[in-house]
Amino acid sequence: MAPKQPNTGLFVGLNKGHIVTKKELAPRPSDRKGKTSKRTHFVRNLIREVAGFXPYEKRITELLKVGKDKRALKVRQEKVGHSQESKEEERGDVQCSPPDEGWWWY
């Protein structure tokens, strides 16, 4: 859908209507929902660094390194369930090494 054009001040036409300047509103507190604060982000990263990954997460990263994406998703679904999108994003941050140059099936 195309963005709405500003009103022209005319009585007829697609952009009819009185010309007004849009009012700048303060951000609502509900706009922050779902965003983590700097402190929370720092604490979570610190805990991750100290504690490491849970055993099922280690298994998933190993499967991803080998290239078994579908199997890794099934393991995650089995252990965590579908509702944990944040875990999926977090796991995406883990770097998987690319296969060696000698592998001919990639």
UniProtKB/Swiss-Prot annotation:
GO molecular function, a single term: structural constituent of ribosome
Recorded GO CC terms: ribonucleoprotein complex; ribosome
Compositionally biased spans, kind Basic and acidic residues: 75-93
Pfam families assigned to the protein according to its UniProt record, in alphabetical order: Ribosomal_L36e
Keywords of this entry: Ribonucleoprotein, Ribosomal protein
Positions of region (Disordered): 75-106
UniProt keyword Ribosomal protein, yes or no: yes
Primary gene name: RPL36
Descriptive protein name: Large ribosomal subunit protein eL36
Record GO biological process: translation
Protein family according to the UniProt entry: Belongs to the eukaryotic ribosomal protein eL36 family.
Signal peptide feature range: none
Annotated organism of origin: Daucus carota
Keyword flag Ribonucleoprotein: yes
